[in-house]
Regions:
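Short, conserved beta-strand edge motifs with alternating hydrophobic and charged residues
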Residues: 78-81, 99-101
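C-terminal helical cap(s) of enzyme catalytic domains, especially alpha/beta-barrels
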Residues: 117-121, 144, 159-173
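Active-site beta-loop-alpha junctions enriched in small/polar residues
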Residues: 6, 33, 56, 82-84, ...
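Catalytic-face loop-and-helix region of soluble metabolic enzyme cores
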Residues: 97-153
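Glycine-rich phosphate-binding active-site loops on the catalytic face of alpha/beta enzymes
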Residues: 42-62, 100-107, 147-166
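N-terminal active-site wall of soluble small-molecule enzyme domains
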Residues: 2-78, 84-89, 115-118
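Catalytic cores of alpha/beta
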Residues: 35-47, 84-93, 130, 134-153, ...
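Conserved strand-to-helix beginnings and helix N-cap segments that scaffold or border functional pockets
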Residues: 13-14, 63-64, 111-112, 140, ...
């Protein structure tokens, strides 16, 4: 379960994560701009199992230090990238889970071709996650053909009449 906790841009809240934790034993990703050390301790304290590190907003030292801190706190880390250069930077910390965000941060357009194009830069022993723009069966099939291990899906579930049924359907594909 991915939970937005960033308040200013995405209207998330740490209380949302606490509420989810009280109702579910599934792993929870804290989705936020993780730029301060205290956020990692807070993530652990509120029940997160994983955090998001966004390569585009961190320098190499921050990436390394935050990754190490998260692992010391026994938090999994999804390292988010947007292009070849960011993947190269991310690989320096040898992450177990690496994601490609299909949203262009400059103009906010989304194309799943980003996942296809960048897949070859991520070693097969990494968990490869496609992020953003996954809206229907066709998108799921396309990303499976791209050898994607997992998906980070938000809007499609939020807009679905029965998100649980949609998740089961896509998992079975």
């Amino acid at each position: 379960i991915s939970c937005l906790t960033e308040e200013d841009y995405f209207h998330g809240n740490v209380d949302y994560l606490k509420q989810i934790r009280s109702k579910s034993d599934l792993p929870i990703l804290r989705k936020d701009f993780m730029i301060e050390e205290y956020q990692f301790y807070e993530a652990k304290a509120i029940g997160a199992d994983a955090v998001l590190l966004i390569t585009a907003i961190l320098d190499d030292t921050q990436m390394h230090d935050f990754y190490q801190l998260a692992r010391e706190l026994e938090l999994d880390v999804l390292v988010e990238t947007h292009d070849e250069a960011e993947i190269e930077r991310a690989m320096k910390i040898d992450p177990r889970i690496i994601g490609v965000n299909n949203r262009n941060l400059k103009d906010f357009t989304i194309t799943l071709e980003t996942t296809r194009r960048l897949r070859r830069y991520v070693p097969e022993d990494k968990v490869f996650v496609a992020e953003s723009g996954i809206m229907d069966d066709e998108d799921v099939r396309f990303l499976r053909e791209c050898n994607t291990d997992a998906f980070l899906i938000g809007r499609a579930f939020m807009e679905a009449e029965t998100p649980k049924m949609l998740a089961k359907k896509w998992k079975a594909m």
